[in-house]
Amino acid sequence: MPVLLECLSHTPLSGYCDPAPEVVAEVGRIHAAARARVADFDPQLVVVFAPDHYNGFFYDVMPPFCIGASASAVGDFGSLAGQLAVPADLALDLAQAVLAADVDVALSYRMQVDHGCAQALEILTGSLDRYPVVPVFINSVAPPMASCRRARLLGDALGRSLARSGQRVLVIGSGGISHEPPVPELAGATDEVAERLIAGRNPSREARAARQARTVAAARAFAAGDSRLHPLNPEWDRAFLKLLEEGQLPALDGFTDSAITREAGKSAHEVRTWIAAFGALQAYGPYRATLDYYRPIPEWIAGFGAMHARPIAETA
């Protein structure tokens, strides 16, 4: 059955630390075109692969992958808040299909997602609940993480099940490429920070505002060239995007955590969401992909990209 893939970078900094107006407008046009494709496709189901930034998943139990059978968005950085329209029975069926394919995945009936998921849904569909949606969390910031190969196999297992569903499916991959915003790490953390990373759910409004202010300040310093954060790496980004565009997904299996961190920054591990999304698409057969946009945007601390793809059989 028909499938459409949309992969895009997200940023919590939009509206807080923006690049030049012409760049904001440029990104807006790319998003509008993607939104029009989705509206024309009119999906019956959305599956969104997304990371989390210590807003919904913590070290008390940190799964490598988790499928949401019920989910709500926390509304960080002004992103949409509220309940996602998750078909619980279908989410459970998908989890069972993934496990049957020998890929270990957790299941949550109380998943919380942040801007990493909600922003993509807002950009592409206009809301959290316009279409039935199954969120799939991929741990991308909290070591240890599943390998890129396992992310691909997760996507493949989901894609094979979705291809048998008889539905028009929109597959979304939401994540940054090269980037390293100021995300805290458990290793070497103070007791206070460690506790927040282990069990920091539902912070106070003041705590969330303070975290937001730190991130915005870091972005302004980064854009001004006064930062120790890892620089953006357009060369690495373009090489990664080219592998996706050419359908060379197995080549991504060899991407190691240490190499990703060294070349593209500690949050570039979010490329696992793109890998999983393309893995799901490739389960439908060979595909044709288009790189719609790429630009390094220091103000958003992001190598910012967007791609869409369809199976070749559906584009002939």
Curated annotation (Swiss-Prot):
It comes from the Bacteria. The keyword Oxidoreductase applies. GO terms for biological process: 3-phenylpropionate catabolic process. NCBIfam families: PRK13370.1-2 (NF009908), PRK13370.1-3 (NF009909), PRK13370.1-4 (NF009910). HAMAP family: MhpB (MF_01653). Catalyzes the non-heme iron(II)-dependent oxidative cleavage of 2,3-dihydroxyphenylpropionic acid and 2,3-dihydroxicinnamic acid into 2-hydroxy-6-ketononadienedioate and 2-hydroxy-6-ketononatrienedioate, respectively. This is 2,3-dihydroxyphenylpropionate/2,3-dihydroxicinnamic acid 1,2-dioxygenase. It comes from Paraburkholderia xenovorans (strain LB400). The lineage of its organism: Bacteria, Pseudomonadati, Pseudomonadota, Betaproteobacteria, Burkholderiales.
